[in-house]
Every structure is written in structure tokens, then in C-alpha cells.
Amino acid sequence: MKLKFTKMHGLGNDFIVIDAINQSVSLDPATIRRWADRHFGIGFDQLLVVEKPGESGDFRYRIFNADGGEVEQCGNGARCFARFVRDHDLTRKNTIRVETACGIIMPTVEENGEVSVDMGIPRFDPARIPFITQERALTYPLNVNDREIEISAVSMGNPHAVQIVPDIDLAPVTSEGPAIESHPFFPEKVNAGYMQIVDRTHIRLRVFERGTGETLACGTGACAAVVSGISRGLLDSEVQVTMRGGNLRIRWEGEDQPVWMTGPAVSVFEGTIDL
């Protein structure tokens, strides 16, 4: 049996997107890992699945990392998801109500082809991240590889640990990122973000993603970094986030308000693969 897919990317964070409404799809972790292999498979950071919704959305959005594990949220993927359902005539709406494992998101396809996404309200309560600590704080000490670092912990539907560094080009992303990802204080693992503040409206960012490794861009990581910077009084409410794959615009008006992310979503090619 052959399965149709579309290869897409958001700032180099790449995906395959599968329509599970108009074709039968059955996935398992071993199959996803095989397809994710960049030498023997298709190659991607995440696999995105478009499904019929429950009662509250237009579509249901499922996300699987390259290691085969299902995760709650992916910001760059959300933009690609929205472009996919529009480009494949699954909807004519500009603003789409999408069900995810962590709640409803509302992507809007703009006239210029970019996609803006209401990413929901960030969570700082340690129990909801989840993060093991005695009480909520702006920053937390974390012992990693025999040194203490200072992080902010926030959930954007998935957990993030964000630290400020003087120069992200020199940050120990690949050597330290895996230790943060698997730190015992994060029982569901965590995405490790490294943020360099250029000024109050501009940051540079690298992210070691849970279950994937470092990617060229991370949408939820950009949201988490900006939210942590605003919470600490270091950033304004609208910030440009520069990652190795390109730029996102993130806007957040403060606690109990949703985070808005705007950026590109690009289709690369369509193909079929044997199940």
C-alpha cells in the first residue's frame, strides 16, 4: 500500500505532512524512525498528521518526533499544517480551528502566504510544564554536566528550558542540550533553548529539541524564549527571533494572554511511500 505525503518546512524545520482524512493511515514508532532517516528514508524533524476533528475544531493535528514519539505541540509544524489544509482544498477558511493534544490553536493564513498562529497561553506552573521544583519562580538553578546554569521553565503545550547566553554561536547546544533534555527535574523531558538578547525587540536563538536534536528553527522554542524574556523584564511585547533557518515574529501582551507567532510555511515536494 502506498501512502501520499507532502514534504514541507518552516525556516528549515522540516516535516512530512500526511492527510489521514482521505487515506487510511496506521503508524508505529519503528516506521516513523525509518522514514525520518535522512539516508535510508525521507528525512524529517517531525511527522504531522491531519485527522478529522472531535466536536470543537475543523481538524485534529498530531505530531510525531523523528524518534517515533508523539508530542503535544510544534509551532513551525502548525504553520505548515495550516498551509497544507488550505493548499490541498481541505478547507477554504483563512483562520482554522485546530485541535491538538494540548488544546485548540488558531492558525491564520495571511494574504502574503505567511501564517500567524495563536499558540495559546503559556504555562508557568511547574506542575503543568511539568518541572520538579518546590515553588514557581522566574528562574531556576539547574545542575548540568557538573556546572550550575540558570533557566526559565515554561510550557507552550510542550516543555521548554530557556537560558540566556552571551553568544549563541559559542553556546554548548550539542554537548549540553542532551543533558538538559533528559534532566530528571523534567519527567517528560524538555526542549533546551539558548537565547542571546540583541536588544529589547530582537533575540537570536538555538534549540535542542526533545526527541529530535538541534533543528534549524523551533516555533514553540521561539515563543518560550520571548515569553521568558518578557517575564523577566528584558524584552518588549513584540520580538523578532532569528534562528539558523530564518526569522519569526513573536508577540505576547503578558500573563493570561495568548502568544502569537508569525512566519513562513513552504511546500517542497509531494511523494508516495510504501507502508
Curated annotation (Swiss-Prot):
Pfam families, sorted: DAP_epimerase
Active site: C74, C218
Keyword Isomerase: yes
SUPFAM superfamilies, alphabetized: Diaminopimelate epimerase-like
Cellular-component GO terms for this entry: cytosol
Pathway where it operates: Amino-acid biosynthesis; L-lysine biosynthesis via DAP pathway; DL-2,6-diaminopimelate from LL-2,6-diaminopimelate: step 1/1
Catalyses which reaction(s): (2S,6S)-2,6-diaminopimelate = meso-2,6-diaminopimelate
Assigned EC number: 5.1.1.7
Residues involved in substrate binding: N13, Q46, N65, G75, N76, N158, N191, E209, R210, G219, T220
A GO MF label: diaminopimelate epimerase activity
Record keywords: Amino-acid biosynthesis, Cytoplasm, Isomerase, Lysine biosynthesis
Localisation per UniProt entry: Cytoplasm
Enzyme class label: isomerase
Cystine pairs: none
GO biological process: lysine biosynthetic process via diaminopimelate
Subunit-structure text: Homodimer.
Annotated HAMAP family: DAP_epimerase
Family (UniProt): Belongs to the diaminopimelate epimerase family.
Function: Catalyzes the stereoinversion of LL-2,6-diaminopimelate (L,L-DAP) to meso-diaminopimelate (meso-DAP), a precursor of L-lysine and an essential component of the bacterial peptidoglycan.
Name of the protein described by the UniProt record: Diaminopimelate epimerase
Species the sequence originates in: Nitrosomonas europaea (strain ATCC 19718 / CIP 103999 / KCTC 2705 / NBRC 14298)
Upper classification of the organism: Bacteria, Pseudomonadati, Pseudomonadota, Betaproteobacteria, Nitrosomonadales
